[in-house]
Amino acid sequence: MTETKKSEELTFEEAMKGLEGIVAKLEEGDVPLEQAINYFQEGMALSKMCHEKLQHVEKQMDFILKDNGELAPFSVQEEDEGDK
């Protein structure tokens, strides 16, 4: 990564900001091929890190407080992704 922090040390918000910056650079279209590949690899690493952080949060939210204060399982219904 070009930043001083390693990807493991980035917060979710920092990683998303980095990913948005990479997307903006690639969308400009004036990036040499080799640099575009480097940006793409960095973006994929940031995307993976964000996904892993979200999965970790989902596991933490596996139990939420019910109205009476007891813990209850929490499940997220995923949207239909359609054809990939």
From Swiss-Prot:
Record SUPFAM superfamilies: XseB-like
GO molecular function, one term: exodeoxyribonuclease VII activity
Subcellular compartments: Cytoplasm
Main location: cytoplasm
InterPro entries linked: Exonuc_VII_S (IPR003761), Exonuc_VII_ssu_sf (IPR037004)
EC number: 3.1.11.6
The reaction(s) this protein catalyses: Exonucleolytic cleavage in either 5'- to 3'- or 3'- to 5'-direction to yield nucleoside 5'-phosphates
GO cellular component, one term: cytosol
One GO term (biological process): DNA catabolic process
Transmembrane segments: none
Keywords attached to this entry: Cytoplasm, Exonuclease, Hydrolase, Nuclease
Pfam (any one): Exonuc_VII_S
NCBIfam families: PRK14063.1, xseB
Entry function: Bidirectionally degrades single-stranded DNA into large acid-insoluble oligonucleotides, which are then degraded further into small acid-soluble oligonucleotides.
Family listed: Belongs to the XseB family.
Quaternary organization: Heterooligomer composed of large and small subunits.
Official protein name in the record: Exodeoxyribonuclease 7 small subunit
Native organism: Bacillus velezensis (strain DSM 23117 / BGSC 10A6 / LMG 26770 / FZB42)
